[in-house]
A protein has these predicted regions:
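Glycine/proline-rich, positively charged
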Residues: 101-153
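Short beta-strand segments at enzyme active-site cores
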Residues: 52-56, 89-93, 129-135
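Active-site/binding-pocket entry motifs
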Residues: 18, 96-97
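Generic beta-strand or strand-like secondary-structure segments
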Residues: 74-78, 93, 113-120
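Glycine/Thr-rich phosphate-binding loops of Rossmann-like dinucleotide-binding domains
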Residues: 32, 61-63, 100, 140-143
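Surface-exposed, interaction-prone regions with an acidic/low-complexity signature
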Residues: 91, 98, 105
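Active-site-proximal loop/turn and secondary-structure-junction residues that shape catalytic pockets
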Residues: 28, 57-59, 94-96, 134-139
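N-terminal binding-site loop/beta-alpha segment at the start of enzyme catalytic domains
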Residues: 2-89
Length: 153
C-alpha cells in the first residue's frame, strides 16, 4: 500500500507495479553529489511519494572508470541502511558499447555481457531484483530502416 500523498501513480506497462509519475534520477551521485546528499534525496523523494527511481551501471556522470557503478553503490548502501527496498520501484540499465573499461568494450548487448552487467548491478545495489532493466544506448549496427547488420549472439 502506497503512503497517502499528492503524487499520482500509473501502472508500469502490463505489470501490477504502480510507479509515481515523477521518477527520481540518480546519475550525479558519486561524482557531483555525495552519498550523504544522495541519502537525503532518496529520503525526501520517498516521503513525497516518489517511488520510481532510475539508475544505471555507468553512473555516476560524467562516466569515468574510477566512478563506474558508484551511484548503484550509494543506492545499495541506502537500501541496506533503511531496509526500504520494498518501497521502491527500481529501474537500472546495462550500458551500451561505449567504454573499454566496461567488460572490455565491444558488443555490450550480448547474453554474456548483459548477464555480467545485471549480476554486477545486483551486487552494487545490495538487492536480489531490479524491477525494470533496460538497454542504455543503442548499438548502431542494429537493424533499422530495412538494413541488416545485427548479429545475434
Amino acid at each position: 500500500m502506497l503512503k497517502k500523498t499528492l503524487m499520482n501513480y500509473k501502472k508500469l506497462g502490463k505489470t501490477d507495479l504502480e510507479v509515481s509519475t515523477i521518477c527520481l534520477g540518480t546519475m550525479t551521485w558519486g561524482e557531483q553529489n555525495t552519498q550523504v546528499e544522495g541519502f537525503e534525496q532518496m529520503d525526501f523523494a520517498l516521503d513525497q511519494g516518489v517511488n520510481f527511481w532510475d539508475t544505471a551501471e555507468i553512473y555516476s556522470i560524467p562516466p569515468r572508470e574510477e566512478t563506474f557503478g558508484s551511484t548503484e553503490k550509494i543506492i545499495g548502501n541506502w537500501f541496506e541502511k533503511t531496509k526500504k527496498r520494498d518501497k521502491v520501484i527500481l529501474a537500472s540499465k546495462v550500458c551500451g558499447p561505449m567504454r573499454e573499461y566496461v567488460r572490455g568494450g565491444g558488443n555490450q548487448f550480448g547474453k554474456k555481457n548483459i548477464t555480467e552487467a545485471l549480476e554486477g548491478s545486483l551486487k552494487r545495489l545490495k538487492t536480489d531484483y531490479i524491477d525494470l532493466y533496460q538497454l542504455h544506448w543503442p548499438e548502431r549496427n542494429t537493424n533499422f530502416f530495412g538494413k541488416l547488420g545485427y548479429e545475434h549472439n
